[in-house]
């Protein structure tokens, strides 16, 4: 198996112990019933993690949307991280990325028929989505990044674990990157190890299964990332596959994601001239950032250069008022999807659709 990317600062263990005590107490207050969890009379599926950084929540949420939207009216509820608005917001055709955040905006653009809403208070958000006057016809709700939001008790709780940062090898913040102890995984009905190498062996998967130490009631799946064709962000040109990129093309990879190293690693086999310009996750591009992007691009060989960015970053770049017109023809967006390994897709799909079918009823809440 590949080496992991985990770096633990042992000097911060005392602070992690204090932090862990607070997290333990909070979870116990829910376990003891002092803090109340609400169960809603509508299928609710939660997707989330117990670590900071990217585990692939958005592509897995989008997978669920694709799976369910052909038979059900799907609503997705997110916190709307770094949005400029407050409270409950239901996305409309003219809703901006600033109002709901980059990932919700991305999902609404890709799936215009879903109800896409943001609300920090997930219980309130679900109530609004169950209101036929606000979000007509809602039949199933997907909670994006809600594994630790325990005020809602979902029917299916999906925990995502990054293959490169296994929770069994990590530790609590700030020494590590875990937001709660590993035993928090016990709340999950389904655990998915994400970002697995495409060529991972059956033996490695068996080792991983043992390392995860799941309970008998839990299901374990493995997924990998797949990349679609590059789409021009501002022009009407044709999409281009990664294999079609000329070998002498020089690429400026502009990202504002949690783990750009994995993306660089995945793109390297297609081109050896990749320069990375990495910003923080959900980065709000400033005027200085836009100038830096242009400056770095102009240093690449003329006639042999392009800019590649992620879907999540593309929605912020496309809406940026200071985007240089000269750069627009050279910017391409790289879509990402997930694929299940070991022929697990059919089993996963049936488990999700069976749950939704058996629990579909009037969307009242209690």
UniProtKB/Swiss-Prot annotation:
SUPFAM superfamilies (alphabetical): P-loop containing nucleoside triphosphate hydrolases (SSF52540)
InterPro entries assigned to the protein according to its UniProt record, in alphabetical order: LpxK, P-loop_NTPase
Record keyword Nucleotide-binding present: yes
GO terms, biological process: lipid A biosynthetic process; lipopolysaccharide core region biosynthetic process
Positions annotated to bind ATP: 51-58
Enzyme class, broadest EC rank: transferase
Annotated catalysed reactions: a lipid A disaccharide + ATP = a lipid IVA + ADP + H(+)
Pathway(s) this gene product operates in, as recorded in its UniProt entry: Glycolipid biosynthesis; lipid IV(A) biosynthesis; lipid IV(A) from (3R)-3-hydroxytetradecanoyl-[acyl-carrier-protein] and UDP-N-acetyl-alpha-D-glucosamine: step 6/6
Similarity field: Belongs to the LpxK family.
UniProt name for this protein: Tetraacyldisaccharide 4'-kinase
Species assigned in the record: Phocaeicola vulgatus (strain ATCC 8482 / DSM 1447 / JCM 5826 / CCUG 4940 / NBRC 14291 / NCTC 11154)
